[in-house]
Amino acid sequence: MTNADPHELQKFSDLAHRWWDPNAEFKPLHDLNPVRLGWIDAHAHLAGKRALDIGCGGGILSESMAGLGAQVKGIDLSTEALGVADLHSLESGISVEYEAIAAEAIAAREPGTYDVVTCMEMLEHVPSPGDIVAACATLVKPGGWVFFSTLNRNLKSYLFAVIGAEYIAQMLPKGTHDYARFIRPSELASFVRATDLHIVEIKGITYHPIGKRFALSNDTDINYLVACRRGA
C-alpha cells in the first residue's frame, strides 16, 4: 500500500499549474528555497553529487540543486506536479530527471545510490512519516547526507503555521496543513534513530514579516530543518 494520502495528493495536484508562480500559492516555498538550499549546500557541497529530492512537487528545490552542479532526480506521486516540473526544466535548460514513484519503492530498487537525499516539507503530509525516513536512510550512500524539513507540533506552530499563515495572512491556501500530522523534533529524532542515520544539526526557520523573508535560527518551535548523515 502506498504511503500517501489521496486527499493530500489531489490538493497539490490541483495547484500544480501555479507551482512556478512566485506570487501565487507556492510563494512561501519560493521565498524559503534560498535558505534551505544554502543550508543543504553548506553541509553536502552539492557540486558533482548525485541527489534525490523526495516529494519534489514542481521541482523548485530540484532545479536549484541542479543549478549548483548536482545530478538530480526528483520523485513525487503527483503526475500533475511532475508534468509542470518537466516542462519548467525544459524551459530553464536545467537538467533534472523526474519520476512518479514512491520513496519506499525507489529505496527497494536503488539502495545506497545517492550522495544526498532531501525530503523537504513532505513528512507532515504522509500517513507514515517514519517509513519515509527509513526509505531515505536506505537510499543514501554510506557517508552521505539526508535532509528533512517539517513543522513542529505545539500551540505556537498551530497559531502561526495554520491560523496565521492560512487564515489571517493568507500566505497559504486554507487546509494546506493538518495540524495532527505535524511532527515534534523528538519524534523525528526517534524515526532517525531507528535507522543507521545520525543527526548532525537541527535548525529552525524564522519568518520575518516586515522584510517578508525567511532566515535560519535556533528557534525550532514552528518550521525546522534536520541534517543527518549515514555512517560510513
From Swiss-Prot:
Entry's Gene Ontology BP terms: methylation
Catalytic function, reaction form: a 3-demethylubiquinol + S-adenosyl-L-methionine = a ubiquinol + S-adenosyl-L-homocysteine + H(+); a 3-(all-trans-polyprenyl)benzene-1,2-diol + S-adenosyl-L-methionine = a 2-methoxy-6-(all-trans-polyprenyl)phenol + S-adenosyl-L-homocysteine + H(+)
Pfam families named in the record: Methyltransf_23
Signal sequence extent: none
Residues binding S-adenosyl-L-methionine: R36, G55, D76, M120
Source taxon at top rank: Bacteria
Alphabetical list of SUPFAM superfamilies matching this protein: S-adenosyl-L-methionine-dependent methyltransferases
KW Transferase (keyword) present: yes
Example GO molecular function: 3-demethylubiquinol 3-O-methyltransferase activity
Keywords: Methyltransferase, S-adenosyl-L-methionine, Transferase, Ubiquinone biosynthesis
Cited InterPro entries: SAM-dependent_MTases_sf, UbiG_MeTrfase
Pathway listed: Cofactor biosynthesis; ubiquinone biosynthesis
Enzyme Commission number, as recorded: 2.1.1.222, 2.1.1.64
Known role: O-methyltransferase that catalyzes the 2 O-methylation steps in the ubiquinone biosynthetic pathway.
Family annotation (NCBIfam families): UbiG
Family to which the UniProt record says this protein belongs: Belongs to the methyltransferase superfamily. UbiG/COQ3 family.
This protein's name: Ubiquinone biosynthesis O-methyltransferase
UniProt source species: Burkholderia cenocepacia (strain HI2424)
